[in-house]
Amino acid sequence: MKHKGAILIVIGVVALAAMILIIGPGEIEDALRKADPVYVLMAVVLEFIILALFTLRWSITTRAVSIDVGKRHLFPMLLVGMAINNLTPSARGGGEPVRAYMLGKYSRASMESAFATVIADRGLDTFPFIFLAVLTIIGIVLYFDLSRWILAALIASVVIIVVAFFLALYVSVDRDAGERITGWILGVVKRFYRKNHERLERRVRSALHEFQSTMRMMLKEKNVLVYGIPISFLIWILEIIRVYLIFTAFGTDISLLVIAEVFILATLIGMIPLLPGGLGAVDGIMIVFYSYAGVSPSVSAAATVVERLISFWMISAMGVAAIPYFGSSVSEKLMDKL
């Protein structure tokens, strides 16, 4: 792991530790001891079901472009990508090129086609995100007494993400739009890269055309949307239920709507490329808002610790452990990303 990444993880852990100290380690420990292990185990099992659904959704996009790779091989690629997202300050996007790289290496598909399947897979998440984001904004107005500035910032961030998604989708499938964006980027590159820029331009335009062709092929494949969108909604619903099970383990009754609201807020915070996986910041947001919703601070902190152990640390550990699966040459490159 690079020194910068390790330092940022330490900073995130220290921030979380500071919040635990403020709340009271003894109270949090008491809450953890009272947790029902059956519900915690159910939350862990549910996380594996969620991972299986993620793998299934990605396999739909790979099949749409005739990339022949089994789910048992996609699964470790998914885990490694998630680990990269969690352990690097990359706005939860650093793992996607890694997934594409591994898919291309394993299936011998072009990098452009492999990357298109990853982009489409992540894009399917946008539909439930928009729905839950609207619910979150409504819920915050009704349940939380936040300043107008915070509410405006939340609305603005959601709008920016939605606009960016549809703009990226437009550029991905429209040849003229892609050419204009590519031309602008190449114009900037030419100022600094004067050697063989004609060759570079040919390679970039060729890669763009293949990427766009693959994206259009997937959008024409009805299974991508017919099955991909419902699976995406199911994944988000199950993630909310997972958090609900954890609170149930602590004997706390909490609204699923409140969990959804905090989940969206935590997702937005996690996208800020400051700390790996929003470590510290996401935990803090979850603890503060659950407490604000009426859950005791000690239970909020204990539930957040358990939730992050399952959804962050367990997944990260599994992803790192899966890296040797792809051989030494790939492993060395992947470890450089951490």
UniProtKB/Swiss-Prot annotation:
<feature type="transmembrane region" description="Helical">
    <location>
        <begin position="36"/>
        <end position="56"/>
    </location>
</feature>
<feature type="transmembrane region" description="Helical">
    <location>
        <begin position="149"/>
        <end position="169"/>
    </location>
</feature>
<dbReference type="GO" id="GO:0005886">
    <property type="term" value="C:plasma membrane"/>
</dbReference>
<feature type="transmembrane region" description="Helical">
    <location>
        <begin position="231"/>
        <end position="251"/>
    </location>
</feature>
<comment type="similarity">
    <text>Belongs to the UPF0104 family.</text>
</comment>
<keyword id="KW-1133">Transmembrane helix</keyword>
<feature type="transmembrane region" description="Helical">
    <location>
        <begin position="124"/>
        <end position="144"/>
    </location>
</feature>
<dbReference type="InterPro" id="IPR022791">
    <property type="entry name" value="L-PG_synthase/AglD"/>
</dbReference>
<feature type="transmembrane region" description="Helical">
    <location>
        <begin position="310"/>
        <end position="330"/>
    </location>
</feature>
<feature type="transmembrane region" description="Helical">
    <location>
        <begin position="254"/>
        <end position="274"/>
    </location>
</feature>
<keyword id="KW-1003">Cell membrane</keyword>
<keyword id="KW-0472">Membrane</keyword>
<keyword id="KW-0812">Transmembrane</keyword>
<feature type="transmembrane region" description="Helical">
    <location>
        <begin position="275"/>
        <end position="295"/>
    </location>
</feature>
<feature type="transmembrane region" description="Helical">
    <location>
        <begin position="6"/>
        <end position="26"/>
    </location>
</feature>
<dbReference type="Pfam" id="PF03706">
    <property type="entry name" value="LPG_synthase_TM"/>
</dbReference>
<protein>
    <recommendedName>
        <fullName>UPF0104 membrane protein MTH_1261</fullName>
    </recommendedName>
</protein>
